[in-house]
């Protein structure tokens, strides 16, 4: 309940920024402002996760291709949004809906989830808690593209560590560190 209240607070505070981002997207590329992708949430239930659109509108495909550094699909304004993590702001609406938390393991696209559950031991344990906008893995530099199994295994290790050692103090620490490490970093693109 505390984090839902904080989600409401952050949503209200970020509304002017969200409006500016929405205008920026509309002025710089055709297509919708928001992008919705199904991901797995608590107990492996599929949930729609909202983000600001950072890529050119392409045909809808069942194949989900991860964005990569210098990906030609990413717009110039979209690159800025990704670098600063402003593309994640609509996920506060997911927090208000109760499908996400501010802190928790980041939700992965359904196609990626199906792939990694077969390759990474204990992968599915991460669905024992609500997914988050930020998490322990993100403040340790694991955000953006996961182009190797080794990177995904390390990311999952942080997710499992978070679940095993959860506390309100840990969540506060992660939120605090997200502002200094998570939003802008070498792995952000």
Residue ranges and their predicted role:
Residues 1-59, 94, 168-189:
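A hydrophobic, helix-centered structural microdomain
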Residues 8, 32, 42-45, 79, ...:
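Gly/Ser/Thr-rich helix-start
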Residues 21, 35-36, 103-105, 111, ...:
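Short, hydrophobic secondary-structure boundary micro-motifs
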Residues 29-32, 69-72, 95, 131, ...:
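A generic fold-level signal
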Residues 35-73, 134-157:
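Short, glycine-rich, amphipathic interfacial segments at transmembrane boundaries or analogous
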Residues 67-130, 174-182:
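A short, structured surface patch at a secondary-structure boundary
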């Amino acid at each position: 309940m505390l984090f839902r209240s904080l989600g409401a607070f952050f949503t209200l505070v970020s509304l002017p920024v969200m409006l500016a981002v929405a205008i920026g997207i509309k002025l710089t590329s055709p297509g919708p402002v928001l992008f919705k992708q199904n991901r797995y949430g608590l107990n492996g239930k599929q949930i729609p996760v909202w983000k600001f659109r950072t890529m050119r509108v392409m045909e809808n495909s069942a194949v989900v291709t991860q964005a990569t550094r210098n990906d030609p699909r990413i717009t110039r304004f979209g690159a800025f949004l990704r670098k600063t993590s402003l593309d994640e702001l609509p996920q506060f609406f997911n927090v208000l809906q109760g499908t996400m938390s501010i802190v928790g393991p980041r939700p992965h696209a359904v196609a990626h989830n199906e792939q990694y559950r077969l390759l990474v031991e204990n992968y599915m344990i991460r669905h024992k808690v609500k997914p988050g906008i930020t998490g322990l893995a993100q403040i340790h530099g694991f955000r953006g593209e996961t182009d190797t199994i080794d990177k995904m295994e390390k990311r999952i290790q942080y997710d499992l560590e978070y679940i095993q050692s959860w506390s309100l103090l840990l969540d506060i620490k992660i939120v605090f560190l997200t502002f200094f490490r998570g939003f802008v970093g070498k792995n952000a693109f």
